[in-house]
C-alpha cells in the first residue's frame, strides 16, 4: 500500500513537470513587442556608416512626423528576414528611417546593405552597443517609432518586423 502511494506521488510529479514544460512551449512571445514606451529620447552622437561623419541624434529627428529607428547587424539572421519590410517602409515619403548598426564590422554592414538594399536615410555605427542600451533595446532586431515633435519613443517592436507589425506601423504613421 505504501509502495503504491509512492508510485502515485512520483507519477503526479512527473505529470506536473511535463504539464509545466509543455505549457511553457505554447508561449508565443515572452516580451511585449508592441509596448508603448513614451520614453524621451536622449541625445547622443555616433559616426555615420558611409561618411564617417559624427551625427547627433537631435539632427536625425527631421521635419517628418515620425522617425523609425531599426537596430540591426549583418550577422543577425532575423534582421535579414525583416529587411524586405524595412525596404517597403523606406519608400514612404512621410517617414525618416534610421538604421543603427549594432556591434558589427562596418565592411560586413556595407556588404549587407549592398546585397539587400538600403531602406535607411542614415546608418549610425553602434560598435559597443551603447546607443541600443540608451534606447532601451533588449537585443536585435528591434524597431522604435519616434514622434519627432515630442522627441519620444511611442512604439517599440522587439524582434523582426512581420506582416502584423508592418500593418501596425503603416496605420500608426498615416
Positions of predicted regions on the chain:
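A short beta-strand-turn-helix
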Residues: 45-67
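Short, Lys/Arg-enriched, disordered terminal segments
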Residues: 1-6, 26-32, 58-59, 91-92, ...
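N-terminal targeting signals for export/organelle localization
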Residues: 1-47
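Conserved redox-active cysteine motifs that mediate thiol-disulfide chemistry
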Residues: 71-88
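Short pre-active-site segment immediately N-terminal to redox-active cysteine/selenocysteine motifs
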Residues: 40, 65-67, 71-75, 139
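Conserved segment of the thioredoxin-like fold in thiol-based oxidoreductases
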Residues: 91-92, 96-128, 140
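Thiol/disulfide oxidoreductase modules built on the thioredoxin-like
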Residues: 114-119, 126-173
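Hydrophobic beta-strand anchors of alpha/beta hydrolase catalytic cores
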Residues: 68-69, 97, 143
